[in-house]
From Swiss-Prot:
Listed InterPro entries: aa-tRNA-synth_II/BPL/LPL, HisRS-like_core, HisRS/HisZ, HisZ
Function: Required for the first step of histidine biosynthesis. May allow the feedback regulation of ATP phosphoribosyltransferase activity by histidine.
Note: This function is generally fulfilled by the C-terminal part of HisG, which is missing in some bacteria such as this one.
Gene giving rise to this polypeptide: hisZ
A biological process term (GO) from this entry: L-histidine biosynthetic process
A single cellular component GO annotation: cytoplasm
UniProt protein name: ATP phosphoribosyltransferase regulatory subunit
Molecular function terms from GO: histidine-tRNA ligase activity
Organism: Cupriavidus taiwanensis (strain DSM 17343 / BCRC 17206 / CCUG 44338 / CIP 107171 / LMG 19424 / R1)
Length: 383
């Protein structure tokens, strides 16, 4: 007999206690974004593939679930990342001059899980600034990311900083690098120095030495000065290190690390990149950076920076307790009781009315009060 209740691998239901926490954090974060002036957008779950993947890297293509549209015959994709969709909205639909701040929250689907235990259906929430090329926008986004994690109750946060411009400058004079690009990125991300030695054999010595040095350029902000002494003294690398130094001093409420080989998302980032970690966990809980080139694919190149996180992951780490206080009410046909319940609910109270025969069943709400008949009416008293 088949098990009709089975779900695909790395797909799971969200049960009430987890769903309450996820929804609480979603509301907290969206309300937080609104206090900074971010406007909510809701891109579609499904788009034509060429639109969904425009301006993105090969990694997003591999993570995108694809199907054929029965109306048009064209290939469509279920979004694996909302960020490119928001870039499309800014570039093509809003078409505003000046600065635009947008935020979003929604499910995404991954054809492959990011890790062994990772969900293939994250709930992505994030914020983006378009139209300002200065580091001030990156500072605001980084501040907002930390505020969102703090709103979720997380503490002891570390920010790792990197810059896509450093690797871009090192590879600019090496057109043949495209053949080994993916392997090179993988070796840098995992700090696999033996693999790097093999991959860089035959490269010009200056670039090779710099690439081999990147995995060692990890640690506190003093790494920036070590990088200045170790890497080629090109204007592009100098600017990138200056930006990292300026961003590092702006971090409040978190420790700062520099990791010049943390290049996840390099294909679509164009400047500073940052990731947030919490103590005791090897994987980041939020990630962001600058991606000025994404809007160009939609016909409007705009400076852009943003961050995102998975609400399901953050909810699993969050100490926030979301067990709502409620009022217990008996089942009674008395119109006065119905009026009392309606008035309490209109005022924002949770009122749970027991059904006949189920008065003593427990639920996940904390009914600390109850409605009782008193004189000719109904009143709320402690339970």
């Amino acid at each position: 007999m088949s098990n009709h209740w089975l779900l695909p691998e790395n797909i799971a239901d969200v049960l009430p206690s987890e769903a309450r926490k996820i929804e609480e954090l979603r509301r907290r974060m969206l309300d937080l974004f609104r206090t900074y002036g971010y406007e909510l957008v809701m891109p579609p779950m499904l788009e034509y593939l060429e639109s969904l993947l425009t301006g993105t890297g090969h990694d997003l293509d591999l993570r995108t679930l694809k199907l054929v549209d029965q109306l048009s015959g064209r290939t469509m994709g279920l979004r694996a990342d909302i960020t490119p969709q928001v870039a499309r909205i800014d570039a093509h639909l809003l078409n505003r001059p000046g600065v635009t701040r947008l935020c979003y929250a929604g499910n995404v689907l991954h054809a492959r899980p990011a890790g062994f235990h990772a969900t293939r259906e994250p709930i992505q929430i994030g914020a983006e600034i378009y139209g300002h090329a200065g580091l001030e926008a990156d500072v605001e986004i980084q501040e907002l990311m930390l505020a969102a994690l703090t709103a979720a109750g997380l503490s002891d946060i570390r920010i790792d900083l990197c810059h896509a411009g450093i690797l871009e400058a090192l590879l600019a004079g090496l057109p043949s690098i495209r053949k080994i690009e993916d392997a090179l990125f993988a070796a840098l991300e995992t700090k696999d120095v033996p693999a790097l030695r093999e991959l860089t054999a035959g490269m010009p010595q200056t670039e090779r030495d710099a690439l081999l040095a990147l995995p060692t350029l990890y640690g506190g902000v003093e790494v920036i000065e070590r990088a200045r002494a170790t890497l080629p003294a090109s204007p592009a690398i100098g600017r990138a290190l200056d930006e990292l130094a300026a961003l590092a001093v702006q971090v409040r409420g978190a420790s700062v690390n520099i990791d010049l080989s943390d290049l996840r998302g390099y294909h679509y980032h164009s400047g500073v990149m940052f990731a947030a970690y919490v103590a005791g966990l090897p994987n980041y809980v939020a990630r962001g950076g600058r991606y000025d080139k994404v809007g160009e694919a939609f016909g409007r190149a705009r400076p852009a920076t943003g961050f995102s996180l998975d609400l399901r992951e953050v909810a699993a780490l969050s100490p926030v307790e979301v067990r709502a206080l409620a009022i217990f009410a008996p089942w009674d046909a008395d119109p006065a009781l119905r009026a009392a319940i309606a008035g309490l609910r209109a005022g924002g109270e949770i009122v749970i009315q027991s059904l006949p025969g189920h008065t003593h069943e427990l639920d996940e709400f904390n009914c600390d009060r109850q409605l009782v008949r008193k004189d000719a009416g109904w009143v709320v008293v402690p339970r």
